[in-house]
């Protein structure tokens, strides 16, 4: 059994780390590089950086901070935001990122996934899926441009159909962002993640909902995800990563030591 990953998520806007609730009302958390260093030293297994307005602004992720992060941390990190070509991806990877993640650009151009995987290898191509549960239709639906509340829009894709599609195109990992749970700290959407796990043959990362230390053990044991991404509980010091890993070990969940 591979060790389960603990992944702090840093949403970036205008050069600062921010955090919202259900992708809205973002507050400033702090500067990117010191936070990245802090999490690496605390025992995080990986970091994810989302330039949350890049796609909706029609630009590529602000690259000015990527190389600075690579200089101060020694754990893998993934960068996302408006990456829509092989050249965009190459620049970010050359600056020191270990993975790149695409979301809205993949919805516009699904074959981008295959082109990136062919050039850089499947292992470093992550596809983010922003999924919203519609209670009226009882469906999980894919959304795009979620970093900008004025431009956020539903796509025509069912969440699980889209996951199957991107895996078939060469995605090496899926991050499932459960929008209903984002920032509210009520637990991961276990039911949605279980359904996604059944459709996903590559590593699956849960995102959205972590509020207590037990939420992490629940998502690993019940949904069989490979990693859990969280923001608020780490940014606000609610759950120290060291304590989380000790607890998971006690629950017989394999994690890397801090």
Curated annotation (Swiss-Prot):
PANTHER family: IMIDAZOLE GLYCEROL PHOSPHATE SYNTHASE HISHF, IMIDAZOLE GLYCEROL PHOSPHATE SYNTHASE SUBUNIT HISF/H IGP SYNTHASE SUBUNIT HISF/H
InterPro entries per record: Aldolase_TIM, His_biosynth, HisF, IGPS_HisA/HisF, RibuloseP-bd_barrel
Name of the protein: Imidazole glycerol phosphate synthase subunit HisF
Primary localization class, coarse: cytoplasm
Alphabetical GO biological process terms: L-histidine biosynthetic process
Keywords from the UniProt entry: Amino-acid biosynthesis, Cytoplasm, Histidine biosynthesis, Lyase
Active site: 11, 130
Xref: HAMAP family: HisF
Pfam families: His_biosynth
GO cellular component terms, A-Z: cytoplasm
GO MF term list: imidazoleglycerol-phosphate synthase activity; lyase activity
Annotated function: IGPS catalyzes the conversion of PRFAR and glutamine to IGP, AICAR and glutamate. The HisF subunit catalyzes the cyclization activity that produces IGP and AICAR from PRFAR using the ammonia provided by the HisH subunit.
Family label: Belongs to the HisA/HisF family.
Species of origin: Colwellia psychrerythraea (strain 34H / ATCC BAA-681)
Localization annotation: Cytoplasm
Annotated transmembrane regions: none
Protein's pathway: Amino-acid biosynthesis; L-histidine biosynthesis; L-histidine from 5-phospho-alpha-D-ribose 1-diphosphate: step 5/9
E.C. designation(s): 4.3.2.10
Quaternary data: Heterodimer of HisH and HisF.
First and last residue of the signal peptide: none
Catalytic activity entry: 5-[(5-phospho-1-deoxy-D-ribulos-1-ylimino)methylamino]-1-(5-phospho-beta-D-ribosyl)imidazole-4-carboxamide + L-glutamine = D-erythro-1-(imidazol-4-yl)glycerol 3-phosphate + 5-amino-1-(5-phospho-beta-D-ribosyl)imidazole-4-carboxamide + L-glutamate + H(+)
Species lineage: Bacteria, Pseudomonadati, Pseudomonadota, Gammaproteobacteria, Alteromonadales
């Amino acid at each position: 059994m591979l060790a389960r990953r603990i992944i702090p998520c840093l949403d970036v806007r205008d050069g600062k780390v921010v955090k919202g609730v259900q992708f809205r009302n973002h507050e400033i958390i702090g500067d990117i590089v010191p936070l990245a260093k802090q999490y690496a030293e605390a025992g995080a297994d990986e970091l994810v950086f989302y330039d949350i307005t890049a796609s909706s602004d029609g630009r590529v992720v602000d690259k000015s901070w990527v190389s600075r992060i690579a200089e101060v941390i020694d754990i893998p990190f993934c960068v996302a935001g408006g990456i829509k070509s092989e050249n965009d991806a190459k620049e970010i990877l050359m600056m020191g990122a270990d993975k790149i993640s695409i979301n809205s650009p993949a919805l516009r151009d699904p074959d981008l996934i295959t082109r990136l995987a062919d050039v850089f290898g499947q292992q470093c191509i992550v596809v983010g899926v922003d999924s919203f549960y519609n209670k009226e239709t009882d469906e999980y639906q894919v959304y795009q441009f979620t970093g900008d509340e004025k431009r956020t829009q539903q796509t025509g894709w069912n969440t699980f159909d889209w996951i199957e599609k991107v895996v078939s195109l060469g995605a090496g990992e899926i991050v499932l962002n459960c929008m209903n749970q984002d920032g509210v700290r009520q637990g991961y959407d276990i039911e949605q993640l279980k359904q996604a796990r059944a459709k996903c043959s590559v590593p699956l990362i849960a995102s959205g909902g972590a509020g207590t230390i037990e939420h992490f053990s629940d998502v690993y044991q019940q949904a069989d995800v490979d990693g859990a991404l969280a923001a608020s509980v780490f940014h606000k010091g609610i759950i120290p990563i060291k304590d989380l890993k000790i607890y998971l070990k006690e629950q017989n969940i394999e994690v890397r030591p801090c």
